[in-house]
Amino acid sequence: MFGNLLTKIFGSRNDRTLKQLGKVVVKINALEAEYEKLSDEELKAKTAEFKARLEKGESLNELMAEAFATVREASKRVFEMRHFDVQLMGGMVLDSNRIAEMRTGEGKTLTATLPAYLNALTGKGVHVITVNDYLARRDAENNRPLFEFLGMSVGVNVAGLSHADKKAAYDADITYGTNNEFGFDYLRDNMAFSPNDRVQRPLHYALIDEVDSILIDEARTPLIISGAAEDSSELYMRVNKLIPSLIRQEKEDTEEFVGEGDYSIDEKARQVHMTERGQEKVEQLLTEAGLLAEGDSLYSAANISLLHHVNAALRAHTLFEKDVDYVVQNNEVVIVDEHTGRTMPGRRWSEGLHQAVEAKEGVRIQNENQTLASITFQNYFRLYEKLAGMTGTADTEAFEFQHIYGLDTVVVPTNRPMVRKDMPDLVYLTAREKYQAIIADIKDCRERGQPVLVGTVSIEQSELLSRLLNQDKIPHQVLNAKFHEKEAEIVAQAGRSGAVTVATNMAGRGTDIVLGGNWKSEIEALENPSEADIARIRADWEVRHNAVVEAGGLHILGTERHESRRIDNQLRGRSGRQGDPGSSRFYLSMEDNLMRIFASERVANMMKKLGMEEGEAIEHPWVTRAIENAQRKVEARNFDIRKQLLEFDDVANDQRQVVYAQRNELMDAESIEETIKNIQADVVDGVISQYIPPQSVEELWDVPGLEDRLAKEFGLQLPVQEWLDKEDDLHEETLRERIVDTWRQAYEAKEQMVGTPVLRQFEKAVMLQTLDGLWKEHLAAMDHLRQGIHLRGYAQKNPKQEYKRESFELFQQMLETLKHDVIAILSKVQVQAQSDVDEMEARRREEEARIQREYQHAEAESMASDNSELADMASHVPVVRDGEKVGRNDPCPCGSGKKYKQCHGKLT
């Protein structure tokens, strides 16, 4: 109450921010008259002037007002569109490492031109990131004339480009592209073997459109580049046949309750658990199928792989539904994005889940994958020097943006007041009654000529609704993952009088629904439209537009509440753009997933108190509040999962940064001769110490073992015993020095034989190839460690601390193995000439081409093993924003406490 009083007196933090931005808007508006008088050439010359002033030491902040005034004036001349004051405010928010919440239809695409131009003046590149290829191409082409007028180049980064085209896209001043492509390019660059193979410049400024979709919805999903592993498709098929024999029970076994079923499903945690009875039944079925030895246990160490197959098959059958989580297209299982309803071709679930779903659907089972490189969007975007984003719905997730990314959210006011009517939810007892009410509402709207957009949460639901509409002979368009090629076209005309559009979730986001239909798309459909054609189409549209406004604007119908309030707000936000009229209502039933899993008891009790009967709907603020509380619970749980994932991935991220930094230094170095000499001395000294312990008596020495090891691993035939027999005064220190010197002489002889340039190139190739192989094995080891780490909680240990400790030990082992393997290869391999190095490089490229790389998203829940347990066991540690380059004198990111140059920076 006291806080509300202070807010009324001083205004909210958002109000105070807008007040500050308003002062800069006044400055920009004051420049407008002066800039209108400039010729085109004088306006274009402003870009060179700004760049020169930056070089002399002025900051972007000092240039902002003039740069924004320049873009506004250029936009008036090129597009005949003038940036509103609220768009200038949005541009300022985006330039200051913040998130701008701007409502649908407020011109986010045009707003983005302001900070994109300003930050491109530095010459370091600007990345404008969208959710799909269509929007990236559309926005780039739409804004290209404006940027080119101002002397800025524009690139588009989408999948399928050649290396040269990608390089050109990244070298442009402003690059549009998708989040996936930018992330994968980063991983590919860090797998390159030559500096020329890299495409990205250092990551400077990212401006993310639909930032909530990318930084929140996709945050649990790591990007993975993987190669094919061993083929086990037959095993997936055989295990798949056993699952239909298992029976589900309603709840998990406890001390008080032991059920009759074989497994139970925890819908909240999206997990499936086998009962003891189920384990015995599965073991019996596996024995009968010849997959498990008589009397053997599924849980013995030798059968871990088989247990993995059983778990994957059980999850595929119980948790993943066709036309909800995936569709089958062209004999392939294609994942459906739960947040947008779009299909994601080329993406695959990890840990054998995708293969289990393929076996369930009877399509061709593709090989399992082995991770070659991976990163989460959370960690990729934190690598940028500057980060900003815009969306129509960010305020509900403001805490997460601040906590994870250090980004404040500013709600930018609309240009015209919002007049959409958001009506309370209607709740029915059954789904059948709910759909009857939805059909009745649609009929009512059609009679009045009011367009309707119906939002569903799955393809299955949209197809059910489509069948019901067909039964009632109501013409409509369906927009879901199966037909998204027609997406923009359908969305463009969804505002016509009486139009009914059924959209899965928020497919079609990014395209405005214009009341009366989109007249521009009608003009584009004509080959050579004349002035008369354009005037006629505009006049027809004016009549249609006014009729739709008269009917009440676009009516939004939600068939179910989403887990997140933000997704519901996105659906509502399609109506009421730029002061247009509109309305929205959600229809719910007690059989909906959210109600059934999270809100059923409380709402059911309310319904009983209110005396509800079949066919009746309840419309009460209590119910709406109860549903929103249920959504808050789910949002908080999902935030916890994302936070836990980030804390675990931060451990891998620190190691990733060390490895990638070393890799890039090795690749950019002219020669790594000094590095090889340093690690050679370490390795040989370490090997000697195993057989001749430091400061030990001669009786403890294992000289034959040392001679044998040096010969087998390093190709060094040294008469160590002979030296000791002949020289009584040969001490341990002197012996060490002699062995190291002899190795160096042998290596120098090899250098003289093949030539210095050839050997230097060979050293680099061996170092990079060995590092890549060991890093790949290390990622697999980290995956295995993470999957079982939550069990440490039962031993009263903190899983997070244990993970940090063990992953650090694994990393240390990897670096020691790297040193040893590199020296062993360089010592033993006989390089005759340049052709040998070329042959090695050719073999590497052939191997690279043979490994069919998959670009995939690991399935979210599997990434943290059992997130619900993990969230309870792990302590909540604040996440620190990172991504800075590690200096040689900085503390090493691995957590050892040493300086980087004395720890993991040693290699470079």
UniProtKB/Swiss-Prot annotation:
May bind 1 zinc ion per subunit. The keyword Cytoplasm applies. Its cofactor is Zn(2+). Residues 898-908 have a biased composition (Basic residues). Keywords: ATP-binding, Cell inner membrane, Cell membrane, Cytoplasm, Membrane, Metal-binding, Nucleotide-binding, Protein transport, Translocase, Translocation, Transport, Zinc. CDD domains: DEXDc_SecA (cd17928), SF2_C_secA (cd18803). InterPro entries: Helicase_ATP-bd, Helicase_C-like, P-loop_NTPase, SEC_C_motif, SecA, SecA_CS, SecA_DEAD, SecA_motor_DEAD. It holds the Pfam family SecA_DEAD. ATP binds at Q87, G105, E106, G107, K108, T109, D512. Signal peptide: none annotated. One of its GO terms (biological process) is protein targeting. It is found in: Cell inner membrane; Cytoplasm. Monomer and homodimer. Part of the essential Sec protein translocation apparatus which comprises SecA, SecYEG and auxiliary proteins SecDF-YajC and YidC. Part of the Sec protein translocase complex. Interacts with the SecYEG preprotein conducting channel. Has a central role in coupling the hydrolysis of ATP to the transfer of proteins into and across the cell membrane, serving both as a receptor for the preprotein-SecB complex and as an ATP-driven molecular motor driving the stepwise translocation of polypeptide chains across the membrane. HAMAP family: SecA (MF_01382). NCBIfam families: PRK12904.1, secA. This is Protein translocase subunit SecA. It comes from Shewanella amazonensis (strain ATCC BAA-1098 / SB2B).
